[in-house]
């Protein structure tokens, strides 16, 4: 099995496992951070390839087609972890669009591939995603809503890259009298 075929298979399993647990809904935002260098067993930022980026992008687009989620591709630290998204998503949520074109050496291979393969791509600096996937320890946490909830899947690595996934939930707020699930006895004021 070639490395690319293995990466595709691992990604398919990981996304399927994730969806079984997280049940993402159409329209929710899914952020992806990825080091294609780490996928190939190299140090982050040193050996990124468009071939690996294409394979990962392709699987993520299939996941999007199946679930209706919106994708956001995190750039590398050289672009302050900005995100590549469809213009329609940026306009819908009034995300501020910034002017930059990701390239493999400043943006990363996956974000660059996404920029050249989305319908109408733009780059934004900030987002609060409903869920996400981190391939190669790229640190997507800054782009997740509070509160992040880790999701464990059967896949621990994509290629040679460590993979983590998370969904989010609303904050539990209040004090000693706060209620988090409506029950008959909590509906009326007494």
Swiss-Prot record:
Pfam families in the record: DUF436
Superkingdom in the source lineage: Bacteria
InterPro entries (alphabetical): Antibiotic_NAT-like, DUF436
Family statement: Belongs to the UPF0340 family.
Record protein name field: UPF0340 protein BCE33L5016
Organism (species): Bacillus cereus (strain ZK / E33L)
